[in-house]
């Protein structure tokens, strides 16, 4: 074991100048004062939520000066700043991460203990903010965390949703969606900035007319105004004085417009206006299976884009005092997928209509300012809006999009005369729809994918025609995760072991986790790592016992798949293997297998029938397995409801096996794979997304890869040759599983939608094709787990190589290659 004193010098000296409470006595004094002001009650009568909120306000007080100073320095030095637009930010709880960020967790813990509270019980009193749902939002959260940690001038921009996606409950084995009223007790981290409110226009009529000088100007009349009020959340840099901002917009009705409607006696119209406005920031991802839902989603997207851009332009003019023609030298705008793609026509609108710039100049500024990250390969997931709805809701924006499309198609047709198929493939407006991905590519100077295989598919297939036109715009930026959240905070036991082994400089420079490689075969280190994993499995087992009244064996393989429920992510492949394993045990009572605990988590979109049926299938099989005494000593199955960031912080550190089994070529990147890896789990996966790069980092011997490759999948799509009915006919195990879906043998239940997806619709995601390879991969997992020394070796290698997948690396690449921003020390 390395003597840490002789290892590379740790960095703790660099945090001496950050503001902090001097000791626990000062903490207790300030806590008491703040609590009396906030709650006006005896400390002994405070609830855990009140204790949490008190500490949150204390932290805000502590960082407020740095928050102000950070923004002052950016303006004084006229540094270029990036604004990261995302429809969601899945930030998770902030109390613990902020305490770690300001290096005050120990003082807070000790002070609370003296006052009679346990910090570990206070932390869960904070609700997970309902500001995001899946990987898109969690990536955005990790990115703004890294921006602040690296002291880069960057901020987030999104919507302050009153309700999150939904709280998931499992009732009678089925997902039930309940309101996620996460703001019910307020949110102490936010600061309402009424003076920064702006107005966003919807509807009305827009047309062009000549002005006094004969130039065309736009007239937009009879529109509805929505007041956008920002709520700012501090994003605290890790052990530095940088405090960036996540700005969240809330929609409010315009009092002037409401009074105007009431003054003409149209009360019904007035209240309809008021309700429609309040809906804009009420729900994350409203159901878009109907016209009203799609209309609301489009309103949400334009609302936060317009509000954010107006705020940015106003700040630029007020603080930078530079020509609007230099805007792109000082401002970078990044759009996280296509939800914020309306940034492009909205910036054009502001530059032309409000700043008086010509079309060509405005377009050049816009393209140089905006960059776009694509997150999807699935054609059905590419965002499109019907032209009539778009035109009615956003008439001025539609005129701009129409002009962008006309100019672009004129250029394409001049380069490729007579090639209408090419024009169709790259048009922004086509077949009655607005194609947002096409708009995003056209209006951005940079287009990136989020894993090497994903970026290559974009160039070769999904956006191939654009790549041939703008090859210089395309690049790859493999996703990353915040090691502060997913290792330091989520797994303090492992973080401490790493500190004791190689020093703590990896906390600042995660690539230094590679210094663990020499310890991969060190018996003493393996023993300590085993103890840490056992402790984390016991913590999760206690949670499962308390929440689900179910005991799980901590000496079993914890095999975990946690992600959004979708057919391409293939939770179905996992649960069919579990059913197959169950049948093997039932058919062979003397058969002994490596004990397993299979854990699932994730939400299905409320309107996605096959995904909801997948959840029902998992729960029915779980009940069947767990209640069978002849089987449940060797395997358990659980679906953990309401998966979120906080639950993830319990699951990732406890995992032995990371299930990353999407159909090859369908997952853009994935970041759960990185979180598992960083906590020492072994990847069981396809060659998809970032799995490809994880495999390259750790090698065949330290992960288990199976299944079709992306080119094989694409070949089947293009040329055919795959028949799921043939798989059914040729494989008795598959036939038994498919029949069980509809013959009532699984808990007396029927799963017709999944049966139809596998057989009647020819198994679009190749679950049956990959079934036997997956079973063999699971056997390989069991074999490797049986050799404890080799398993520990693989676990150490995964941890050591995971530093590459820190979002700090990703963000540094964005900063250097796309945004051209520099760190600002202070």
Protein language model features and the residues they cover:
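A conserved ligand/cofactor-binding region detector
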Residues: 2-826
